[in-house]
Regions:
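C-terminal helix-to-coil terminal segments
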Residues: 19, 92-105, 119, 260-319
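Rossmann-like adenosine-cofactor binding region
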Residues: 173-267
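Phosphate-coordination loops involved in phosphoryl transfer and adenosine-cofactor binding
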Residues: 3, 139-142, 223
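An N-terminal-biased, well-structured beta-alpha scaffold segment characteristic
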Residues: 2-92, 213-215
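Phosphate-binding beta-alpha-beta segment of Rossmann-like dinucleotide-binding domains, i.e.
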Residues: 89, 94-142
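A short, aliphatic-rich alpha-helical micro-motif
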Residues: 41-42, 60-63, 138, 191-193, ...
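NAD(P)-binding Rossmann-fold cofactor-contacting core
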Residues: 162-178
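Glycine-rich adenosine-cofactor-binding loop
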Residues: 95, 136-159
């Protein structure tokens, strides 16, 4: 009997040895890129541990025995979901694992803004000592979070001690712990102007693509803080630039963009009411080990039942 072949598109350091030791009957192969995998291995591999832009339609078609992709990231929008669905390939992601790190970034963005840390830093650089500078308090502020998944829920946990009012917007409008209220996407517009802070955590799907338009930003309170840690495609880039340059909102913290990486002459770099991070909020030293623990739990299920449950992506919804 040939043993099952598992290919990782990530080098996992010492984790590689422990995987090989924990599963002596399986064959593990580790590569840096999808293009490095030899054709004969593509023919035989059954499980792919991935995070690589090379996993496209052609790649999947070249792997006739592929049964499960364990994606070491949350967003799966760059994968050819239609082919994966057609072939009945199982897809899992790392949602929830990155939520701790991303939610801490969201909290730091809010505090950075409300406590005017940026102004203090600019003052320091210019040797200006301004003892009248006054930070804003978070208590009683109203927060609206687009999406109520694991990232939003973890963010709510961190924000709770600050005594804010937190509203969620989701497809179903179903109640989730920690939120004061949750409404459906249809109700979004009636809640936008009440929010002091708006946080997007939505994944990219057909429904969320360019979900926000200029109209939404016109409804928002002009003192509003907008944070995007979901996907950049929630709003068309040229509309985002227009909205910010016309000061329809006070400030934006953006970690994701419609076109990544940002081009050096992108207009967003010229605006003073934007704080940019380079899609780094999910970077985490612990991600490989946490994601591999999840992979091992799922692998045990796969070996026993030929199926996995935890963090399975609904291929019809795209998350």
């Amino acid at each position: 009997v040939k043993s099952m072949k598992i290919v990782s598109l990530k080098r996992l350091g010492e984790i590689e040895t422990s995987l090989i030791n924990n599963y002596p009957d399986l064959e593990f192969y580790f590569f840096k890129n999808a293009v490095d995998i030899p054709t004969e291995l593509k023919d035989e591999l059954e499980i792919l541990i991935g995070y690589d832009s090379g996993v496209d339609k052609n790649f999947i078609n070249a792997c006739p025995n592929l049964k499960w992709i364990s994606w070491y990231a949350t967003g799966v929008n760059n994968l050819p979901l239609d082919v994966i669905k057609e072939r009945n390939i199982i897809l899992t992601n790392t949602r929830g694992i990155q939520a701790k790190q991303v939610s801490e970034f969201v909290l730091s963005f809010i505090l950075d803004d409300y406590k005017k840390m940026r102004t203090s830093y600019v003052n320091q650089v210019n040797k200006v000592y301004d003892s009248k500078l006054t930070g804003k308090r978070l208590s009683d502020e109203k927060v609206l979070i687009l999406g109520t998944g694991s990232l939003a829920q973890q963010t709510v946990k961190l924000l709770k001690p600050f005594e804010l009012e937190i509203i969620g917007i989701s497809k179903s409008g179903h109640h989730k712990d920690g939120f004061d209220n949750i409404y459906t996407i249809e109700d979004l517009e009636s809640h936008l102007n009440k929010a002091d802070i708006i946080i997007n955590t939505l994944p990219e799907t057909q429904e969320t693509y360019h979900l926000l338009s200029e109209r939404h930003f016109k409804i928002m309170n002009d003192k509003c803080l907008f944070i995007n840690v979901g996907r950049g495609t929630i709003i068309e880039e040229k509309i985002l630039i227009k909205v910010l340059s016309h000061n329809l909102i006070r400030h934006a913290y953006l970690d994701v963009f419609e076109n990544e990486p940002l081009d050096a002459n992108n207009e967003l770099y010229k605006l003073d009411n934007v704080t940019i991070t380079a899609h780094i909020t999910g970077n985490d030293k612990n991600i490989k080990s946490d994601a591999t623990k999840l992979f091992e739990r799922n692998l045990d299920d796969f070996l026993n039942k030929n199926d996995v449950i935890e963090n399975r992506v609904d291929l019809y919804k795209g998350y």
